């Protein structure tokens, strides 16, 4: 374990205040409905308590010396970043599927793929029971690469899912995303991303860890707890392995029992991947406009409307060119 000691003045953020918002996304597929109620029921109280804590800390006039400890504890084994084993037998390698959404209904648990296929799945764990019916949700789906072919669907917010698909399909976005900024910061500090692990599930929320090491010295290693949606986005951009805790893979994983092909005539309103993006204070947002164009292009490709997809691609290129010109004028 490594420690740093220095005078620091910063607002205090309590771990318990972070827990409520973390539950809404990066969660398992079995409790989406109850999580939504828990989140909205506690949001106002949480925001007020967090604001009060920040206001209280900002009135401090005295510098205090604090100690920051870097350690890894998400997997519950007490291992630290310095002694982690990249080939730990408790973890299995995985790959990211080009899945766009998941849903549960009368036909069972379905994963909609980017190429139009519908994968019908069942719980790998016999004790998993039947999932409640719920509408389509954006999701990141990991496939175990240990020969079992198990899938681990992680329900996420729409934006991380869109950005992940953009990274996997090499869709260029004019402005750097948060994940690109993190990648550049790691490079500037002389570190490199080693791997990402989905480590555990607490109630219905999954947790992940991002491992970094000093360039040229793999023994100098630190780790950070992240949401799986963020960690996986970074891993894809940095082209590093994504590992999943074996217990999670086998207890929460899904087995594919049927793989079909969507009809080309499937209406666009049937289980749309994307909904209208949030806009700050209702005003036009260039980022939202750009993602709308990306959304429409990808939707057309999914439904094999390639002529229309080419038109959206051209519109996207013109929009990005105008935006770049506006930036320098």
UniProtKB/Swiss-Prot annotation:
The lineage of its organism: Eukaryota, Viridiplantae, Streptophyta, Embryophyta, Tracheophyta. It is found in: Nucleus. Residues 287-322 form the UVR domain. GO terms for molecular function: nuclease activity. Bifunctional nuclease with both RNase and DNase activities. Involved in basal defense response. Participates in abscisic acid-derived callose deposition following infection by a necrotrophic pathogen. PANTHER family: BIFUNCTIONAL NUCLEASE 2, VON HIPPEL-LINDAU PROTEIN. SUPFAM superfamilies: Hypothetical protein TM0160. Its EC number is 3.1.-.-. InterPro entries: BFN_sf, Bi_nuclease_dom, UVR_dom. Belongs to the bifunctional nuclease family. One of its GO terms (cellular component) is nucleus. Keywords: Hydrolase, Nuclease, Nucleus. This is Bifunctional nuclease 2. Residues 121-256 form the BFN domain.
């Amino acid at each position: 374990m490594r420690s740093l000691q220095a005078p620091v003045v910063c607002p205090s953020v309590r771990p318990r205040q972070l827990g409520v918002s973390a539950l809404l996304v990066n969660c398992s597929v079995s409790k989406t409905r109850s999580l939504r109620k828990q989140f909205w029921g506690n949001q106002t109280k949480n925001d007020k308590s967090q604001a009060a804590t920040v206001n209280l800390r900002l009135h401090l006039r005295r510098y205090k010396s604090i100690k920051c400890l870097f350690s890894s504890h998400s997997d519950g084994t007490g291992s630290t970043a310095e002694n982690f084993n990249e080939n730990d037998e408790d973890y299995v390698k995985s790959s990211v599927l080009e899945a766009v959404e998941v849903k549960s209904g009368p036909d069972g648990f379905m994963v909609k793929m980017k190429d139009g296929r519908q994968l019908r799945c069942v719980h790998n764990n016999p004790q998993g029971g039947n999932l409640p019916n719920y509408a389509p949700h954006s999701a990141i789906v990991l496939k175990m690469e240990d020969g079992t072919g198990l899938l681990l669907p992680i329900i996420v917010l729409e934006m991380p899912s869109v950005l992940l698909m953009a990274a996997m399909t090499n869709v260029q976005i004019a402005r750097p995303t948060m994940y690109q900024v993190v990648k550049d910061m790691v490079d500037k500090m002389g570190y490199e991303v080693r791997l990402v692990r989905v480590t555990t599930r607490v109630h219905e929320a999954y947790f992940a860890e991002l491992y970094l090491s000093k360039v040229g010295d793999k023994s100098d290693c630190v780790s950070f707890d992240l949401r799986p949606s963020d960690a996986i986005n970074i891993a894809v951009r940095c082209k590093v392995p994504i590992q999943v805790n074996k217990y999670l893979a086998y207890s929460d994983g899904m087995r594919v029992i049927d793989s079909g092909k969507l009809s080309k005539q499937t209406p666009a309103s049937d289980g749309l991947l994307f909904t209208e993006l949030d806009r700050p204070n209702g005003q036009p947002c260039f980022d939202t406009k750009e993602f709308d164009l990306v959304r429409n292009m990808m939707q057309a490709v999914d439904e094999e409307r390639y002529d229309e997809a080419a038109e959206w691609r051209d519109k996207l290129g013109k929009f990005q060119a105008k935006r770049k010109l506006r930036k320098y004028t």
